[in-house]
Swiss-Prot record:
It comes from the Eukaryota. It comes from Tabanus yao. GO terms for biological process: vasodilation. InterPro entries: Kazal_dom, Kazal_dom_sf. Residues 1-21 form the signal peptide. This is Vasotab-TY1.
Amino acid sequence: MKFTLFSVLVVLLIATFVAADDCPRICTADFRPVCGTPSGGRRSANRTFGNQCSLDSHNCLNKGDTYDKLHDGECK
């Protein structure tokens, strides 16, 4: 009984930490490129992301290095 209760508490604790991170980590492999431009006036080159999900994931995981969608397709 104690082991079962302990196991349930561990699972709930893990689920809480996983739920706190809402960043998409797994994106589909479909190649629908989008061109991103650095947010906030940073002076760096535009960057091509494999798809919108990849751009969103990058922005979520890298708060100080975000990109705005410039247009569909690869950056020129």
